[in-house]
A protein has these predicted regions:
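N-terminal Rossmann NAD(P)H-binding glycine-rich loop of SDR-like oxidoreductase domains
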Residues: 3-23
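NAD(P)H-binding glycine-rich loop region in Rossmannoid oxidoreductase-like domains
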Residues: 39, 47-87, 95, 110-115
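Flexible, glycine-rich beta-alpha linker
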Residues: 114, 152-171
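Active-site Tyr-X1-5-Lys
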Residues: 130-155
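Substrate-positioning beta->alpha
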Residues: 139, 167-172, 187-209, 216-220
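Amphipathic terminal alpha-helices
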Residues: 291-295, 304-322
Length: 322
């Protein structure tokens, strides 16, 4: 098949593109500057961004399938995130409709649904985001439902926190663990979270590409189990082959750190990864159910927590990130 991918040079996107190439597909990817992880791979680069309708047309010409993974994950203003994640996605969707692309898969996020409380969230729960990024993804999903026609086949996937080789944000957790400390965000080691290895997100994306029924279909894609911080600590310690000491980080401390770091970054014109918005997200429980994607797309988790963390840490060590 001819497949067009946005966000193909990023963390999840580069793994998806590699999987598509291994399956023998012709892959074009939207590129703003460098191919990064895809350098040397037999991909067809299409220079441009989501504002460049002509580039989108070029990428989708004759395409059998479009994967939309490009997104802005942080910005100091809601309108900046909305412009990238909602308006940019609408440009892509409308261009795909005009090009007659038979299947579109778009990456959303658990952040669009919001945190969980008494049980893992399902696709039937109302969307209640608590971060600016989550709001932008919620608005993106709502735009898709408004814009989709009766003949469209669109799948929205919502992963939680994604880890694996090439990931640069959760990396900081493993770097701290490499010094013998396991930070427990929120302070409760028994708090439960969903997280997923990038290989399983790619599996979900590939399966979603095969679902050709008309309509908009939404799925969480995650680990089949939810984990506690204690389980994450144990798996990380085993992979690092060292004992980890717990460092509880109460919500107020995390929020203070996010606020302080954001203000400090502002002095230098930077918006840091840890900011007030991110701190607000980090202090909640985030769990989701994968029963729907298991039932309808036959999804099965392929990497356990222990195997996934071990695989990730080995890659970080091999590339001198740890």
């Amino acid at each position: 098949m001819k497949i067009f991918v946005t966000g193909g040079t990023g963390f999840i996107g580069s793994h998806l593109v590699e999987a598509l190439l291994e399956q023998g597909h012709e892959v074009r990817t939207l590129v703003r500057s460098k191919l990064k992880w895809l350098a040397g791979r037999p991909v067809v680069p299409v220079k441009g961004d989501l504002d460049n309708i002509e580039a989108l047309r070029e990428g989708m010409r004759g395409a059998d399938l479009v994967y939309h993974l490009a997104a802005l994950v942080k910005a100091p203003k809601q309108e900046t995130l909305n412009y990238a994640n909602v308006e940019g996605s609408e440009n892509l969707l409308r261009t795909a409709q005009k090009a007659g692309v038979p299947k579109i898969v778009m990456l959303s996020s658990l952040a669009a649904a919001g945190p969980s409380f008494s049980r893992p969230l399902t696709e039937e729960d109302p969307l209640m985001p608590i971060s600016m990024y989550g709001v932008s993804k919620k608005l993106m999903e709502e735009m898709v439902h408004r814009t989709a026609t009766g003949s469209d086949s669109i799948t929205l996937l919502r992963p939680p926190a994604v880890y694996g080789p090439r990931e640069e944000q959760i990396l900081s957790f493993f770097q701290i663990a490499g010094r013998g400390i396991c930070p427990i965000v929120g302070g409760n080691a028994d708090a439960r979270i969903s997280m997923v290895h990038v290989d399983d997100v790619v599996q979900g994306l590939l399966l979603a590409g095969t679902k050709r029924e008309q309509g908009v279909h939404t799925y969480f894609v995650s680990s089949e189990d939810v984990y506690t911080w204690n389980q994450i600590k144990t798996a990380t310690g085993e992979a690092l082959q060292r004992r980890l000491f717990t460092l509880p980080l109460p919500p107020k401390l995390v929020q203070l750190a996010g606020s302080t770091i954001e203000r400090a970054g502002g002095l230098f014109g930077a918006y840091p990864d840890l900011n007030r918005d991110k701190a607000r997200e980090m202090t909640h429980q985030w769990t989701c159910s994968v029963e729907k994607i298991k039932r309808e797309l036959k999804y099965r988790q392929t990497r356990s927590l222990q195997d996934g963390i071990r695989h990730t840490i080995r890659w970080y060590q091999k590339h001198n990130w740890l």
